C-alpha cells in the first residue's frame, strides 16, 4: 500500500504539516498498533519523523538514510538503539553527483532551488556524494513494515531503485512526500509519474 501527499498550494501543504502527525498516527495505528515494526526512513534529515515513529510505535529495527555527515553524527547519538544510519543518498544509479546543502537542512537536494522560493535558496555548501540503490542494500527479502521517502525531488529515482522489493511485496506501507513541481530545477519526474509507477505494483 502506498500513501502519497501532494499539494499544489503552499498554504495547503503548511496546514497539512501542522496536522499530519495526528492524522498519520491514526492511520499507522490501523496497521501497527501493538506490533513491532521494521522501519526505513529515506531522507531522515534531523530525525523529526524518526522521533515521531519511535515515540508512537514499537521499533524492531530502523534503517535511516541521510547524506549530510553532520546530521548523521547527531542521529547516531540520539537514536542509536535499534537504528542503523547510512550516510549516503539513494537513487536508481550508483554514481557521484553534486549535492546542494542549504542553510535550512531539510531543503538539501541533488537539485538547485528555483527562484520561486527565494527564502529557501541560501546554499551553505556543495558536496559530491555517491548515491546507492535500495535493492542492492535490501537484497535478502527483508520484510519492511513501513518505508518513508522524503528526498527533495529524487523520490521517483529512489522508487525505481527499489522495484525488486516492490514487486516482491516486501514493503507493507510506503509513504512518499512529493515536492511542488516548481521548487527545484530539472527534476525529471512529476507527481503523476510517481503515481502511475506505483500503480504497477498494486
Please provide the spans of the model-predicted regions:
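Conserved acidic-Pro-Pro-aromatic motif
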Residues: 40, 52-64, 82, 137-149, ...
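SAM cofactor-binding core of SAM-dependent methyltransferases
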Residues: 19-104, 114, 120, 180-185
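Conserved residues in the N-terminal Rossmann fold of short-chain dehydrogenase/reductase
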Residues: 87-88, 128-131, 148
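S-adenosyl-L-methionine
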Residues: 4-11, 15
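A recurrent flexible, glycine/aromatic-enriched loop bordering the glycosyltransferase active site
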Residues: 119-127
Amino acid at each position: 500500500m502506498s500513501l502519497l501527499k501532494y499539494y499544489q498550494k503552499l498554504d495547503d501543504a503548511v496546514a497539512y504539516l501542522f496536522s499530519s502527525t495526528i492524522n498519520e498516527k491514526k492511520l499507522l495505528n490501523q496497521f501497527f498498533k501493538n506490533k513491532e515494526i521494521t522501519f526505513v526512513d529515506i531522507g531522515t534529515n534531523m530525525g523529526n519523523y524518526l522521533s515521531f515513529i519511535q515515540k508512537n510505535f514499537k521499533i524492531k529495527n530502523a534503517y535511516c538514510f541521510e547524506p549530510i555527515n553532520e546530521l548523521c553524527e547527531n542521529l547516531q547519538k540520539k537514536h542509536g538503539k535499534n537504528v542503523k544510519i547510512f550516510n549516503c543518498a539513494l537513487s536508481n544509479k550508483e554514481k557521484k553527483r553534486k549535492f546542494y546543502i542549504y542553510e535550512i537542512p531539510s531543503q538539501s537536494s541533488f537539485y538547485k532551488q528555483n527562484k520561486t522560493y527565494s527564502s529557501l535558496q541560501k546554499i551553505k555548501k556543495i558536496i559530491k556524494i555517491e548515491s546507492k540503490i535500495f535493492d542492492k542494500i535490501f537484497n535478502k527479502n527483508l520484510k519492511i513494515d513501513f518505508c518513508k521517502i522524503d528526498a527533495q525531488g529524487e523520490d521517483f529515482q529512489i522508487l525505481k531503485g527499489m522495484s525488486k522489493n516492490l514487486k516482491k511485496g516486501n514493503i507493507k506501507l510506503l509513504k512518499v512526500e512529493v515536492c511542488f513541481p516548481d521548487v527545484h530545477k530539472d527534476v525529471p519526474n512529476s507527481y503523476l509519474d510517481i503515481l502511475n509507477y506505483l500503480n504497477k505494483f498494486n
